[in-house]
């Protein structure tokens, strides 16, 4: 088998395994009473080399990730999710104060949610660094302004000692 054909076959096998995983995971979450004719219908369409059309890689990943997200959300108490993301739940509104984490730094991607505690800790460190940086920047800009003001005052004093118009 030529290398190109072998590479294509490996890619096709990976795609098939990926598709099978996506379907098996998604089927766990389907209601048995749902109409599954769309699965059968999809296998009937075979335009390319007799191969059925399957969802593309992004669609398969979405199926897998949404299933994992469902598993994750069903296995973690909602209060824990709120703690991770710095939101207040109605049950714990006054008991635990969690520092707010910038929502721009946290991903709602299910795989990212698996490591959300690490992401929250990282975001906290970054916010502390940015606050320190802002404080240092403010101190630097204030001292620079003071230096500029002092320089301006001394130049004004020097310019006042020289005659305004030179007579020749």
Curated annotation (Swiss-Prot):
Organism classification: Eukaryota, Metazoa, Chordata, Craniata, Vertebrata
Q: What is this protein called?
A: Uncharacterized protein C2orf80 homolog
Q: Which Pfam families match?
A: DUF5563
Record region (Disordered): 125-168
Q: Where is the composition biased (Polar residues)?
A: 151-162
Domain of life (superkingdom): Eukaryota
């Amino acid at each position: 088998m030529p290398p190109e054909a072998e590479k294509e076959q490996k890619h096709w096998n990976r795609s098939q395994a990926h598709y099978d995983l996506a379907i098996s995971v998604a089927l766990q979450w389907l209601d048995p009473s749902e109409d599954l004719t769309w699965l059968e219908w999809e296998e009937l369409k075979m335009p390319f080399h007799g191969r059925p059309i399957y969802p593309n890689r992004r669609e398969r990943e979405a199926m897998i990730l949404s299933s994992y997200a469902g598993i994750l959300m069903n296995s973690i108490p909602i209060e824990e999710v709120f703690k991770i993301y710095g939101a207040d739940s109605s049950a714990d509104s006054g008991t635990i104060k969690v520092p707010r984490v910038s929502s721009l730094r946290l991903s709602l991607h299910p795989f990212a949610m698996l490591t959300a505690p690490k992401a929250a800790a990282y975001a906290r460190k970054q916010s502390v660094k940015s606050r320190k940086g802002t404080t240092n920047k403010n101190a630097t800009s204030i001292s620079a302004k003071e230096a500029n003001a002092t320089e301006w005052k001394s130049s004004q004093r020097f310019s006042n000692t020289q005659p305004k118009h030179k007579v020749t």
